């Protein structure tokens, strides 16, 4: 069995391509069911976010799984394979496992170290479990990846340093105020960056929001998002009297506030500290504001300097995580390699039991006068001999299967004990049983569709 991943993300595909491969909530469940009906695919999970669409499958053979999954993507979304082949990445086995650990821990995210993706991976896994498209392999792999991601954020600082300008402003504010609880935010201008910064401040405890804008209607629209108030630029001096934090991004061609305008306001405020963030280019706030006591002014360059420093810090943490991920891969692949042991052991015991049963039949034919008690003793003794003979080979097989040469060991063991025919028969029986289950499931779905048409 092979583990396979096919996907598109923000690194490989522009948004106009990614948006063609977006699963709806209902669509994901139906897609999982359809994909799981494919003969070669034993398990499947679909991970869909605004930045990535990924399909994880456990399949009989990697090349067949690749073809089926590629065709599935094309047919499900009605897109020719040629249109997305250059944007599609395909990873197998250890590469696919490593990719999942990187995705879960936020290492592969647009904003390195973000934690939202962990919840999305968990939701994708739970949906697969709910619709019974996961089995032994993915139940183990995804649980391990989710547990690792939680540990990564606990044991490293991968998500602790701001790597966006808007969040860097929040970090600066915390250094000045300690806490934003009860603080009042004044947003000057209704630009996107102002909104993002205000959103972060609001999430960190700031309670009152006022939006000042040249157009009152736009100010009102933004203020509503934070259940705040709005005012015009003419009312800015009055709004500054009660503000603790000012975020400015108006897009004006000149300064909207300087020392001359703010000095008398600071007197009325009794020089209560004022934290000001100018994220406009060109700048909104005159640098001469630095001359005023208790005015803490930061512009876009200050914030980008913090971001650059934090990006470097996250990169160092990412190197630590890479080492941790390699350890996780070894742990999983060691377990995964032992999965091939169970069918071999079962086949070996099957063969040994057949030989023992045949021997007992011959004894009964040649010695028909043996009592039931005597036959019981012989049967028990021969079974004991079989178990003793199998014990050491089975123990050694389990140990050697967990090494880097595990696959070769399993292959040699299979040939040494001539288990090919038994394994082939058991595999065929499993395929028949699986096909029967899929036919039953498909029939039930058709009945439901006929009863409850769209």
From Swiss-Prot:
Q: Which GO terms describe its biological process?
A: protoporphyrinogen IX biosynthetic process from glutamate
Q: Where is this site: Important for activity?
A: 99
The question of whether Oxidoreductase is a record keyword is answered with yes
Active site at which residues? 50
What molecular function terms (GO) are annotated for this protein?
A: glutamyl-tRNA reductase activity; NADP binding
Q: What class of enzyme is it?
A: oxidoreductase
Where is region (Disordered) located?
434-454
Which annotated residues bind substrate? 49-52, 109, 114-116, 120
Concerning SUPFAM superfamilies, the annotation shows:
Glutamyl tRNA-reductase catalytic, N-terminal domain, Glutamyl tRNA-reductase dimerization domain, NAD(P)-binding Rossmann-fold domains
Q: In which pathway does it act?
A: Porphyrin-containing compound metabolism; protoporphyrin-IX biosynthesis; 5-aminolevulinate from L-glutamyl-tRNA(Glu): step 1/2
State where NADP(+) binds. 189-194
Gene3D superfamilies according to UniProt: Glutamyl-tRNA reductase, N-terminal domain, NAD(P)-binding Rossmann-like Domain
Reaction it catalyzes: (S)-4-amino-5-oxopentanoate + tRNA(Glu) + NADP(+) = L-glutamyl-tRNA(Glu) + NADPH + H(+)
Q: What EC numbers are recorded for this enzyme?
A: 1.2.1.70
Q: Which UniProt keywords apply?
A: NADP, Oxidoreductase, Porphyrin biosynthesis
Q: Which InterPro entries match?
A: 4pyrrol_synth_GluRdtase, 4pyrrol_synth_GluRdtase_dimer, 4pyrrol_synth_GluRdtase_N, GluRdtase_CS, GluRdtase_dimer_dom_sf, GluRdtase_N_sf, NAD(P)-bd_dom_sf, Shikm_DH/Glu-tRNA_Rdtase
Q: Which residues form the signal peptide?
A: none
Its domain comment says: Possesses an unusual extended V-shaped dimeric structure with each monomer consisting of three distinct domains arranged along a curved 'spinal' alpha-helix. The N-terminal catalytic domain specifically recognizes the glutamate moiety of the substrate. The second domain is the NADPH-binding domain, and the third C-terminal domain is responsible for dimerization.
Q: What does this protein do?
A: Catalyzes the NADPH-dependent reduction of glutamyl-tRNA(Glu) to glutamate 1-semialdehyde (GSA).
The family this protein is said to belong to: Belongs to the glutamyl-tRNA reductase family.
> What's the further remark here?
During catalysis, the active site Cys acts as a nucleophile attacking the alpha-carbonyl group of tRNA-bound glutamate with the formation of a thioester intermediate between enzyme and glutamate, and the concomitant release of tRNA(Glu). The thioester intermediate is finally reduced by direct hydride transfer from NADPH, to form the product GSA.
Instruction: Please describe the quaternary structure of this protein.
Output: Homodimer.
Identify this protein by name.
Answer: Glutamyl-tRNA reductase
The beginning of the lineage is: Bacteria, Bacillati, Bacillota, Bacilli, Bacillales
